[in-house]
Amino acid sequence: MKAKTLSRHLREGVKNLSRNGWMTFASVSAVTVTLLLVGVFLTAIMNMNHFATKVEQDVEIRVHIDPAAKEADQKKLEDDMSKIAKVESIKYSSKEEELKRLIKSLGDSGKTFELFEQDNPLKNVFVVKAKEPTDTATIAKKIEKMQFVSNVQYGKGQVERLFDTVKTGRNIGIVLIAGLLFTAMFLISNTIKITIYARSTEIEIMKLVGATNWFIRWPFLLEGLFLGVLGSIIPIGLILVTYNSLQGMFNEKLGGTIFELLPYSPFVFQLAGLLVLIGALIGMWGSVMSIRRFLKV
């Protein structure tokens, strides 16, 4: 496209915005509210994924070995478990190591258990991790049936509920965001339709004298682009300011736990870029949907 032609399309796009001032304001306001909600939902979903990933990384199967099992029996059990599909790693932990872990995890209260160092009631353990955390329950059920297994612990019931909750939350978030984006496209499309109705005779004349569809389409595409980008400015500003404060408060109270928010950078800048891109795309798509029927003379 020639620079002169592009300049003409840009001028027309800006002129279209000023011709319908109130509708432009209404559309930008609607896109602003929509993208703000999209930004909030994306922030919530991405941080929820962050929490879920941290939890998933901590999900493990603790296989307590039958005290009657000899060293050769333990080796066979380890070999059998390693043959299970989707097992990522198997780590042996002696009962002495298990007691130390218990004492450490309980802090000051754990000192009471130091009395058991001479007569340790705990069992030797294999710590098994799945390649995909969602396969933990399936792997645990297979291990339970093996010889020389005293019992298996992996948070039965809680793990399944956790994964179901995370999956449901993600799906709900996706549906809500899709609905909001559709609403924004509908509003932009209606705004541009008003401009096109006002210029329908001009468009027909341009078609009759040989103007290509794209020559006619470009100013409206740019108008939609401008509407979408303008609508993203306020949501980005609000997210940049509020996320910093929210992260400080959140991490001050829950720092060091799995419930730490994503780092301010690069998260907010990635989100800002995504909102600009979403705004531009829904604006241009709204334009495409509104103008196509007018390109037939």
Swiss-Prot record:
It is a multi-pass membrane protein. Residues 46-171, 241-270 are extracellular. The keyword NADP does not apply. Coiled coil: none annotated. Residues 1-24, 193-219, 292-297 are cytoplasmic. Keywords: Cell cycle, Cell division, Cell membrane, Membrane, Pharmaceutical, Transmembrane, Transmembrane helix. NCBIfam families: FtsX_Gpos. Interacts with FtsE. Part of the ABC transporter FtsEX involved in asymmetric cellular division facilitating the initiation of sporulation. Belongs to the ABC-4 integral membrane protein family. FtsX subfamily. This is Cell division protein FtsX. The lineage of its organism: Bacteria, Bacillati, Bacillota, Bacilli, Bacillales. The gene is ftsX.
